[in-house]
């Protein structure tokens, strides 16, 4: 029986994680749930899974949740704030932590889980985009087990030999016969939209992903392919990959989730329906397997699997991320922070779809900072980048 803390339980990944728990009640128990301000959904989750603890982002949400649970006769202890989230990520009785809080907000609790030597299921890609070196070093120092949950990184992990799985983040790809890691991406809903029309695309159109069911922020990131750019940065840290060992391909069907090229000419790929329950179930059970509730692939109904090179004119955010990864963590932290502000502004109707890349590029050009050596320095860069991005949003929104 594994005992879980779920950081980000009310988000898309958190809900899918709880679906896997529900499918395997004899294998998992939920000890703590941590979320932002979605009190209604957190109330439902506490009623269904009866965790010992629940934590909300602020006192107001926590008070409302506490009243809801008291009225329902549920004895879950309700906490609030970042420090409480960190404490729930390090509970003695918890062995596995799902790190699924979107954005920089999840950094502190994820790092706390690593320092406590937990088995950390990494779904918060921003942790590695902003703190890759620090996080990988802390995982190694405290003997924490880091398992990737993103469908692409989980696919790569499954396609790697066991010594590389054990030596995540520092083992040599070349010494174990790996020549390249191939990240695949659907290209999002605007893959075939005329370039001249991209500026007029609406948030609703950007969030209509053809294959995956995701939250609004990550849906926009998929449309710009910033999501793939962040995954590129994350993959370099997770798999100790140099730029020349990385490759990105468009794969519109989202059936092959990523691939690994070997020096003998072999290519290993992980295939599956585009459903996050599959990589979540794999990470939760590794090295064993448990049912995820996902229907198996029907190869007779699949049709054609196609591939193409990403077009940098259509996806400038992808190239910004690749370039930032070469510059270092100050640049990747800056890009991630600017992008969060830009996407929020687009979803709010303040800027156009094509302005997202323009804001990101402008902020990268305006900020030049030394490499961070601590979470505090990362957060300082993050804060500066957000302020510059807010100014840029005003500039482009005029």
Curated annotation (Swiss-Prot):
**Quaternary structure and interacting proteins, as annotated:** Homodimer.
Q: Which domain of life is it from?
A: Bacteria
The catalysed reaction is: 2-C-methyl-D-erythritol 4-phosphate + NADP(+) = 1-deoxy-D-xylulose 5-phosphate + NADPH + H(+)
Q: Needs which cofactor? A: Mg(2+); Mn(2+)
A GO MF term: manganese ion binding
Function of the protein: Catalyzes the NADPH-dependent rearrangement and reduction of 1-deoxy-D-xylulose-5-phosphate (DXP) to 2-C-methyl-D-erythritol 4-phosphate (MEP).
Q: Where do the annotations place Mn(2+) binding?
A: 150, 152, 231
What protein name is recorded for this chain? Answer: 1-deoxy-D-xylulose 5-phosphate reductoisomerase
E.C. number, please? 1.1.1.267
Q: What class of enzyme is it?
A: oxidoreductase
Q: What protein family does this chain belong to?
A: Belongs to the DXR family.
DNA-binding among the record's keywords?
no
Binding of NADPH, residues:
10-13, 36, 38, 124, 126, 215
Q: Which UniProt keywords apply?
A: Isoprene biosynthesis, Manganese, Metal-binding, NADP, Oxidoreductase
Q: Which GO terms describe its biological process?
A: isopentenyl diphosphate biosynthetic process, methylerythritol 4-phosphate pathway involved in terpenoid biosynthetic process
Q: Where 1-deoxy-D-xylulose 5-phosphate is bound, by residue? A: 125, 151-152, 186, 209, 222, 227-228, 231
Q: Which InterPro entries match?
A: DXP_reductoisomerase (IPR003821), DXP_reductoisomerase_C (IPR013644), DXP_reductoisomerase_N (IPR013512), DXPR_C (IPR026877), DXPR_C_sf (IPR036169), NAD(P)-bd_dom_sf (IPR036291)
What pathway is this protein said to act in by its record?
Isoprenoid biosynthesis; isopentenyl diphosphate biosynthesis via DXP pathway; isopentenyl diphosphate from 1-deoxy-D-xylulose 5-phosphate: step 1/6
């Amino acid at each position: 029986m594994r005992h879980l803390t779920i950081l980000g339980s009310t988000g898309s990944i958190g809900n899918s994680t709880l679906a896997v728990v529900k499918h395997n009640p004899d294998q998992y128990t939920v000890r703590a749930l941590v979320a932002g301000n979605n009190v209604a959904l957190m109330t439902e989750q506490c009623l269904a899974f009866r965790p010992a603890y629940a934590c909300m982002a602020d006192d107001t949400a926590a008070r409302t949740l506490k009243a809801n649970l008291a009225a329902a006769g549920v004895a879950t202890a309700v906490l609030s704030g970042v420090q409480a989230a960190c404490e729930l990520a390090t509970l003695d009785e918890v062995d596995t932590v799902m790190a699924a809080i979107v954005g920089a907000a999840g950094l502190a609790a994820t790092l706390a889980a690593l320092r406590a030597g937990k088995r950390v299921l990494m779904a918060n890609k921003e942790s590695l985009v902003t703190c890759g070196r620090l996080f990988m070093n802390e995982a190694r120092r405290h003997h924490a087990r880091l398992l990737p949950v993103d469908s692409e990184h989980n696919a790569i992990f499954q396609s790697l030999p066991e010594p590389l799985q054990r030596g995540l983040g520092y083992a040599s790809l070349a010494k174990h016969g790996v020549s390249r890691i191939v990240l695949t991406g659907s290209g999002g809903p605007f893959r075939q939209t005329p370039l001249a029309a991209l500026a007029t695309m609406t948030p609703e159109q950007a969030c209509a992903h053809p294959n995956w069911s995701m939250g609004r922020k990550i849906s926009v990131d998929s449309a710009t392919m910033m999501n793939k750019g962040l995954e590129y940065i994350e993959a370099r840290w997770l798999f100790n990959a140099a730029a020349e060992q990385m490759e990105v391909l468009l794969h519109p069907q989202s059936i092959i989730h990523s691939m690994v090229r070997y020096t003998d000419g072999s290519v290993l790929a992980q295939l599956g329906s585009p459903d996050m329950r599959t990589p979540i179930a794999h990470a939760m059970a590794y090295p064993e397997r448990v049912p995820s509730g996902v229907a198996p692939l029907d190869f007779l109904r699949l049709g054609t699997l196609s591939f193409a090179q990403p077009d940098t004119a259509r996806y400038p955010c992808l190239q910004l991320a690749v370039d930032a990864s070469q510059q270092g963590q100050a640049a990747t932290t800056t890009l991630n922070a600017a992008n969060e502000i830009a996407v929020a502004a687009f979803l709010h109707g303040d800027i156009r779809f094509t302005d997202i890349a323009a804001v990101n590029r402008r902020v990268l050009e305006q900020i030049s900072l030394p490499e961070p050596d601590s979470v505090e320095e990362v957060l300082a860069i993050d804060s500066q980048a957000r302020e510059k991005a807010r100014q840029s949003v005003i500039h482009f929104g005029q």
